[in-house]
Amino acid sequence: MQIMIGSSIKHRLTMLVKNAVDGCVAEGLLAGGNFPPVEMEMTKDTVHGDYATNFAMVMASHARMNPRKIAEMISSHFRDGEQILEKTEIAGPGFINFFVRENVWAEQLKDIESLGNHYGSAETGRGKKVQVEFVSANPTGPLHIGHARGAVVGDVIANILGMSGYEIFREYYINDAGNQMNNLGKSVWYRYQELLGRSVEFPDTCYQGDYIREIAGDILKKDGDIHLTSNEDSNIRFFTDYAAGIILEEIKQDLKDFGIVFDKYFSERELYVNDGVARLLADLEEKGFIYRDDETLWFKTTDFGDDKDRVVVRKNGEPTYFAADIAYHKNKYERGFDSVIDIWGADHHGYIPRMHAGIQALGHSKDALRVVLVQLVNLLRDGKPVAMSTRSGEFVTMKEVVDEVGRDAARYNFLMRRSDSHLDFDLEVAKRQSNENPVYYVQYAHARICSILRMAKERGIELPSFENVEPQLLRIPEEIALIKTLTRFPEVVEGSARTLEPHRITFYLNDLAGLFHSYYNKYKVISDDEAMTRTRLFLVKCIQTVLKNALTLLGVSAPEKM
């Protein structure tokens, strides 16, 4: 039987169910076999206990038995030797609800102390190598705010998977072999001529931004008018390479300033230089997935569930972007990645079935490629929409947003919604030093705790360890709620890793910070009661650890003073 392990209490309750099922099988009450996993979830309302499982309902079809009867059978075989349960209840069609003894909750703080900055880590992905490819914007201009959201989503997914034991490789795919690159070179070439006094008609397909004029000016300053006497085709190649090189270096620097560093920048050109596309097409043809129609090569993606077959080589003999994309993914698997995660703009949703067809044709499972879609960002200033682009077509850049609101606020705000939902980003709110600003609200909780710990030290109070506190003193509802929330952190990380949903971490942080601020405003941590002071200091120290661990996952700092 597969067991889904999260936090300590969750694991113990899961084992309780597993052992009860084994007992039922041993007595012939249930038939043996491959049982479904035991899923144990923390309840949203304590009226229904602290944890609940729907295992009996999932088992009903397997056992061909009424789910409530299965639930009763399993419950009657619970052997709670550790005495962690106050009681269990069967609810609805067959849920089993678990009520944990109050004194057990405080014991969970020991795990936080002993694991420290590793609290929340897991070994789920041990031995598995995962590549996360994200941003991958053409080097034709600065990264804009849409790229910024995808950059944070990809980076934090990589962090979460790394904390879950996976070996992570971050990669940026440089689309530098298509018509857009040629248009970049033409754009700079035309501006260069303009700067030298020539009258040039500027096509609509060319890039209009001021950065194009700046690059042309750099070339003019360096080379003078020497390029006017050169062949236009060779000029465009030179201007393309020169501009792409400058833009890519600026992209790398902007990403670094945003806290994002890639393990590899993979050039699309490598696929052609190393015959990657040609080898892919030969491989697909050998497997019978290619056919020719009117001098066009088609890939039979419908064999793998796509709604129509796709062109991989045009009539002019040029491979399509799709062919290059499959070749690139073939290269990924050849480099030994067990799984590949791509972060795409939501407008690429229709591209997923053909990519799944491509990797299946190469002999890989559909599950070996997971795609996370990132929706658009609506930029606001005090609730009013901000123009996302100028008349010349320049978008608000990632650098402009990060420079205005700061790295921490930008990263946190981009993760305030599910990645596949539209996001409103208010620049003024993100700059406020108040509870209206979500990242300030969370960071202030951490800074507040640091202030409490400094005050204790100034008063000569030694910061306690679990051995010299009295956890049974932590019994008021606010303290139990805080401990339960702290206990939930490993489950949140596990859930985020499984679903590739980094917003779960920000939601969790908002909850934890809210509970702490409310507790702080209502109760004194440092008081005349020495035992209570030590115990509450230990509690807030644990809260500090979890806040910092969660913020670190998001690539956001945990300031000690604010």
UniProtKB/Swiss-Prot annotation:
It is found in: Cytoplasm. It catalyses: tRNA(Arg) + L-arginine + ATP = L-arginyl-tRNA(Arg) + AMP + diphosphate. One of its GO terms (cellular component) is cytoplasm. Its main location: cytoplasm. InterPro entries: aa-tRNA-synth_I_CS, Arg-tRNA-ligase, Arg-tRNA-synth_N, Arg-tRNA-synth_N_sf, ArgRS_core, DALR_anticod-bd, Rossmann-like_a/b/a_fold, tRNAsynth_Ia_anticodon-bd. Gene3D superfamilies: Arginyl tRNA synthetase N-terminal domain, HUPs, Isoleucyl-tRNA Synthetase, Domain 1. NCBIfam families: argS. This is Arginine--tRNA ligase. It comes from Syntrophus aciditrophicus (strain SB). The gene is argS.
